[in-house]
Amino acid sequence: MKNIFLHSLSLENYRNFKNLELKTDNTPIILIGENGSGKTNILEAISLFYPGRGLRSAKLANVCKTSEDHCLVKALLQSKLGLAEFTTQFKRSSNRRITEYNESKIANNELSKFTSMVWLTPHMEGIFTSGSNDRRKFLDRIVYNFDPKHAELVSKYEYYMHERNKILVEDIRDDNWLKIIEEKMADISNHIANNRLKTLEFMQQAIDDLENEFPKADLSIDGIVEQKILNGKENIVSFITAELYQTRSKDKLLGRTSFGVHKSDFLVKHQKKNILAKFCSTGEQKAILIAIILAEMNYAIKLTKIAPILLLDEVFVHLDDKRRQYLIEFLTGLNMQLWVTTTNLEGIENFANKAQLIKL
């Protein structure tokens, strides 16, 4: 099994840190400090070495230290391809982010070729009651760990969708180019939808197989394209192309694409109660979310033989003793690099004895 882990992390002008240097190894790491000390900022910096905008989905201008034009995050990381140096930097003046692998520029969506990462934050605990966009992105992040090429597909789809919207809204008379774009969107959509369905099948099996102290969930996806595939419809690409063609006039008025895999919703049910997670209590929602994360970790390791980095922000807060103890035993048994934030060690003393403590 390959372990993805950080050997070192350097921050320059990042959030509240002017300069920070951390040396780590493939063991659990506990970041301990008062609220506002920068614990979550460190997790966010690590998450930037995975496709997307990090665990906060922050705008570039917000990650640089106040009054500074640039910020830099550097990591020496044991990746899927071996030991490598990764850097990502931002400049307010250009509003650009540049990511490098061993001093060679790479696209953000290429990061899943090198790293594997899972995170859980307090913000995510509202994912079941927020908009479908958050849930869909959560599902796609899970897919990245099973299929690294999925991130590139999602990025390409969003690019072509933006191009289509531009042609329609600006009334650019180029039916040829529009047809090509819609055909590309249709082909990519087919791959995205199938990847999601395949991953959900893996995940459901993982949830059903894993006996733990957290409630089991039933996972599904509510999307026209995914449903057509499940129903055995043939010529999916032709179907999507036709739908995009038929919605041109409507989308021109709306200024957006009204049909496609970007409209799908990730649905989660409390298995025992047979109700959607959004109707469960906040405590149950957190427990269900943890159960999904545990299943993802467990199955990703079994299926891909790669242990990702796990980032947990205040995960032990509001957990009862039984669930806290189970979670600690599960996590320490995974033999992977785990980053945990906390304001104190109460209730996790035994876990702390096996971890590297970093006080902020």
Curated annotation (Swiss-Prot):
A Pfam family recorded for this sequence: SMC_N
GO molecular function, one term: single-stranded DNA binding
Coiled coil, from the record: none
List of residues binding ATP: 33-40
GO CC, alphabetical: cytoplasm
Superkingdom of origin organism: Bacteria
GO biological process: DNA replication; DNA synthesis involved in DNA repair; double-strand break repair; SOS response
Keyword vocabulary terms for this entry: ATP-binding, Cytoplasm, DNA damage, DNA repair, DNA replication, DNA-binding, Nucleotide-binding, SOS response
Classification via InterPro entries: DNA-binding_RecF (IPR001238), DNA-binding_RecF_CS (IPR018078), P-loop_NTPase (IPR027417), RecF/RecN/SMC_N (IPR003395), RecF_2 (IPR042174)
Family: Belongs to the RecF family.
Classification via NCBIfam families: recf
Matching PANTHER family: DNA REPLICATION AND REPAIR PROTEIN RECF (PTHR32182:SF0)
Function: The RecF protein is involved in DNA metabolism; it is required for DNA replication and normal SOS inducibility. RecF binds preferentially to single-stranded, linear DNA. It also seems to bind ATP.
Protein name: DNA replication and repair protein RecF
Source species of the chain: Rickettsia rickettsii (strain Sheila Smith)
Name of the gene: recF
